[in-house]
Amino acid sequence: MAGMALARAWKQMSWFYYQYLLVTALYMLEPWERTVFNSMLVSVVGMALYTGYVFMPQHIMAILHYFEIVQ
């Protein structure tokens, strides 16, 4: 049973990866170009998440102070 569930999960992840390749047109690139693109994408998303994690609390507190919700 666990083997079947694992195979099904693997098939689903393969389908999502295939869809990602088609939507972003990465299937036309060579493997090294695909690696460069994916590395840059992961870097940009990582920096965006980090920036949101670091600066969002400050901005939220500034908004709350501006509308006098928090003193």
From Swiss-Prot:
It comes from the Eukaryota. Residues 30-34 are lumenal. GO terms for biological process: ceramide biosynthetic process; protein localization; sphingosine biosynthetic process. GO terms for cellular component: endoplasmic reticulum; endoplasmic reticulum membrane; serine palmitoyltransferase complex. It is a multi-pass membrane protein. Keywords: Endoplasmic reticulum, Lipid metabolism, Membrane, Sphingolipid metabolism, Transmembrane, Transmembrane helix. The record marks 28 as: Within the serine palmitoyltransferase (SPT) complex, defines the length of the acyl chain-binding pocket, determining the acyl-CoA substrate preference. Residues 1-12, 58-71 are cytoplasmic. The chain crosses the membrane at residues 13-29, 35-57. Pathway: Lipid metabolism; sphingolipid metabolism. InterPro entries: Ser_palmitoyltrfase_ssu-like, SPT_small_subunit. One of its GO terms (molecular function) is serine C-palmitoyltransferase activity. It is found in: Endoplasmic reticulum membrane. Component of the serine palmitoyltransferase multisubunit enzyme (SPT) that catalyzes the initial and rate-limiting step in sphingolipid biosynthesis by condensing L-serine and activated acyl-CoA (most commonly palmitoyl-CoA) to form long-chain bases. The SPT complex is composed of SPTLC1, SPTLC2 or SPTLC3 and SPTSSA or SPTSSB. Within this complex, the heterodimer consisting of SPTLC1 and SPTLC2/SPTLC3 forms the catalytic core. Within the SPT complex, SPTSSA stimulates the catalytic activity and plays a role in substrate specificity, which depends upon the overall complex composition. PANTHER family: SERINE PALMITOYLTRANSFERASE SMALL SUBUNIT A. Belongs to the SPTSS family. SPTSSA subfamily. Component of the serine palmitoyltransferase (SPT) complex, which is composed of SPTLC1, SPTLC2 or SPTLC3 and SPTSSA or SPTSSB. The heterodimer consisting of SPTLC1 and SPTLC2/SPTLC3 forms the catalytic core of the enzyme, while SPTSSA or SPTSSB subunits determine substrate specificity. SPT also interacts with ORMDL proteins, especially ORMDL3, which negatively regulate SPT activity in the presence of ceramides. Interacts with MBOAT7; the interaction plays a role in MBOAT7 localization to mitochondria-associated membranes. This is Serine palmitoyltransferase small subunit A. It comes from Rattus norvegicus (Rat). The gene is Sptssa.
